Amino acid sequence: MWGYVHLISWVAIVVLTVTALAIYSKSTKGFTILQMINRIFYILVILSGVMMVQYSVEQSWILAIFKILMGIIVIGVVEMLLSYRKQQKPTGMFLMIFIIVVVITVSLGFYLSGGYPLFN
């Protein structure tokens, strides 16, 4: 069950982040609402990740620690990306880092879980 919560939360974070970036110029209030909803999903990701960490450590404790660090970095990059957007500063570098770090984190997550819950 925690695998599904984790996966859905990560997908929601990515979708909400991209949506917030896209609507900022049209609605700063909508942007702020999406940013707050994103933060709720951070809590779900952290909670579900803590519940699943024992399975990842069994697979490879080094990769599990690296994935935990990458997950924290993703959350930090999302926050920087959204705050730079709100301050109307250039976000290109953070967007590129966001894409790279998300791909690495998702790849590690599926490797450590053996593809669960997407590939049973």
From Swiss-Prot:
Keywords: Cell membrane, Membrane, Transmembrane, Transmembrane helix. Coiled coil: none annotated. The keyword Glycosyltransferase does not apply. GO terms for cellular component: plasma membrane. It is a multi-pass membrane protein. The chain crosses the membrane at residues 3-23, 33-53, 62-82, 92-112. InterPro entries: UPF0344. The keyword Transmembrane applies. It is found in: Cell membrane. NCBIfam families: PRK13673.1-4. Belongs to the UPF0344 family. This is UPF0344 protein lwe2280. It comes from Listeria welshimeri serovar 6b (strain ATCC 35897 / DSM 20650 / CCUG 15529 / CIP 8149 / NCTC 11857 / SLCC 5334 / V8). The lineage of its organism: Bacteria, Bacillati, Bacillota, Bacilli, Bacillales.
